[in-house]
């Protein structure tokens, strides 16, 4: 179902919800983060052929800092691969925003070919970068983690292609459809496979497919993704981008902007509460597997709290005003680009 957002008197600011206070999970950070961050950016700049302006943006992005809070116990080799993937994922997000569905599909083919056939020699830049981190990752990742990474990354590209088609056709999906596709466009699911890789876990499918484990991953994905929709709304609205839950809620429920922000904020808080509830109701698979499950679930929790902290310290959403926004929760809206 598609329609346009009803026009109202244009607001000049929004007040974002206080998600940081609602999240009581402690922040942890990997001790190797500075070295991994520097070397990973160097890897991206060399492989991605970025302009000076885009390089500056990646310095302000601080993807290595995010990665180090999300994988705090990883050894240096695993952290470095995870940093490379995170920088690369943001790079893919940036280039996919500039593409139509055909361009997105071409990128997907290059990436997935490199993952499914690592013995081949890719010719595109993105294919070469994919192969480079993938051959390092598969040295120690369990077969299950490798398969989950590839399958969920494939789902990511299917969803991003659908998003590009919706953007081209001016389609704003209903909330239920948006939630389903956003869980894949977020890129969180392959990052959950990296939790297994970064911590040298070998979890069987019957555990990873358990409703509570899947529910924990979904709750973490929802918090990371929906809070991101709040934090990125200002930049996105200035570009006319409608792939955002705030826009979807305004469109479907006829809410004004601040009410829509509050609505999404309440959903974010509910996702944190859902995560804690499921975590307290984990079944047991025996002492050895329970320890691996605990490490995996801790990794999901690290993503929740790490992403919230990073969002205000990165320059991606609030420029250099992130810490001020964190304190006041007031975001002055950017003018729409012509």
Swiss-Prot record:
Annotated binding of (2E,6E)-farnesyl diphosphate, by residue: 316-317
Xref: SUPFAM superfamilies: Terpenoid synthases (SSF48576)
Motif DDXXD motif boundaries: 93-97
Keywords on record: Lyase, Magnesium, Metal-binding
Residues that hold Mg(2+) 1 according to the record: 93
Keyword Cell division listed: no
Transmembrane region(s): none
EC number: 4.2.3.-, 4.2.3.125, 4.2.3.126, 4.2.3.127
Residue window of motif NSE/DTE motif: 228-236
Site (described: Plays a critical role in the stabilization of intermediate cation): 90
GO biological process: isoprenoid biosynthetic process
Gene3D superfamilies hit by this protein: Farnesyl Diphosphate Synthase
Protein family per UniProt: Belongs to the terpene synthase family.
Entry's free-text remark on domains: The conserved DDXXD and NSE/DTE motifs are important for the catalytic activity, presumably through binding to Mg(2+).
Role according to the record: Terpene cyclase that catalyzes the cyclization of farnesyl diphosphate (FPP) to various sesquiterpenes, including alpha-copaene, beta-copaene, beta-elemene, alpha-muurolene, gamma-muurolene and delta-cadinene.
Entry protein name: Sesquiterpene synthase 2
Gene: STS-02
